[in-house]
A protein has these predicted regions:
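Winged-helix-like regulatory helical subdomains adjacent to P-loop NTPase cores
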Residues: 33-85
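Amphipathic alpha-helical "lid/sensor" segments that cap RecA-like P-loop NTPase cores
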Residues: 2-55
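Short, Lys/Arg-rich nucleic-acid/phosphate-binding segment
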Residues: 111-123
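Short amphipathic alpha-helical interaction segments
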Residues: 88-104
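A short, conserved structural fragment
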Residues: 102-113
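A cross-kingdom feature that marks ATP-driven nucleic-acid transaction machinery
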Residues: 122-289
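Short hinge/gating elements
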Residues: 53-56, 80-81, 116-117, 153-165
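Short, surface-exposed connector motifs at secondary-structure boundaries
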Residues: 5-6, 77-79, 251-256
Length: 289
């Protein structure tokens, strides 16, 4: 739909629409990404300005309560107790609403990969990028949008945060890339399952995560990956931090290789040492090719 956009712009386009063809088709390929976002989201007559709430009204009787829960998740409440605190709803109501949102695939339940039976390691997130982008940025912009200052609001308040917003979405894209290429012989093992690991690093006694974990469940091999959607190249420190985490997933799995996924490439040190350290470097351009 937007063939002339850069890989970065295509990724952002995907990240704010959830990849829904209907929404992407509304992007005018003759306009810049900024103009398209401003026209569709930050404009009183833009199609996306009221789309998420309209969908909730169509789907649920008490749409306002569902909107509150979706908003809480979009803004960082990933566990039931956190959602309860942000919405002031009872636990039973939160569980009921979450179940309905799961059924409609607006949200998804995420487990720490290799620890799916650990009920303490469960997080909720928005599976739909359009809902995520809208609930993260539009409610605070309503006053500006209604007096036709939406584009200025977007350029000053939202555009500088797009890379941060894309962080979680880029991780999902990288996991999808891993699965899509499972049988391409690109990697040193056949990835049959991909996810994210999160929990406590016992050595450092701190919370941490591994952005990408690809498992070859037949050979008990794993690929560990780190993802950065930033304007700076990935460096030695980020690679070393990834390699330090290889003992955190289930001990059945032996690490076959490491992956670094990057919007802005890699430092010379990383490129010079990648082969020796068993690291595969994957710039965003390779993901689109």
């Amino acid at each position: 739909f937007v063939p002339d956009y850069s890989c970065e712009e295509k990724a952002i386009c995907y990240g704010i629409t959830g990849g829904v063809a209907k929404y992407i088709s509304m992007f005018d390929s003759d306009k810049s990404l900024d103009d398209n976002i401003a026209d569709l989201y930050f404009n009183p007559s833009g199609f996306m300005y009221e789309e998420p709430r309209n969908l909730l009204v169509q789907e649920f009787r008490n749409a306002t309560v569902y909107d509150d829960v979706v908003s809480a998740i979009a803004n960082g409440a990933n566990k039931v107790v956190e959602i309860k605190d942000k919405t002031n709803l009872e636990s039973a109501s939160v569980h009921n609403i979450l179940q309905h949102l799961l059924e409609t695939r607006i949200i998804e339940k995420t487990y720490a990969i290799t620890e799916e039976n650990n009920k303490k390691k469960v997080m909720y997130s928005l599976s739909d990028g359009m809902f995520m982008f809208w609930h993260k940025f539009i409610p605070r912009a309503v006053a500006a949008i209604e007096i036709d200052n939406g584009k200025q609001y977007y350029l000053s308040q939202v555009k500088p945060k797009l890379h941060e917003y894309m962080g979680e979405i880029f991780e999902k894209m990288c996991r999808q890339y891993l699965l899509m290429n499972a049988f391409s012989n690109k990697f040193s093992c056949t990835v049959l399952q991909a996810g994210k690991w999160f929990g406590t690093n016992p050595a450092k006694k701190e919370q941490t995560d591994i952005d990408v974990v690809g498992l070859d469940t037949t050979e008990n091999k794993a690929i560990l990956g780190e993802c950065k959607f930033r304007n700076t190249p990935m460096d030695k420190k980020q690679l070393e931090e990834l390699m330090d985490r290889d003992g955190l997933i289930d001990k059945r799995y032996k690490v076959a290789e490491y992956h670094l996924y990057s919007l802005s490439g890699f430092t010379d040190w990383v490129k010079d040492n990648a082969v020796a350290l068993n690291v595969r470097l994957i710039p965003i351009e390779d993901m689109y090719n």
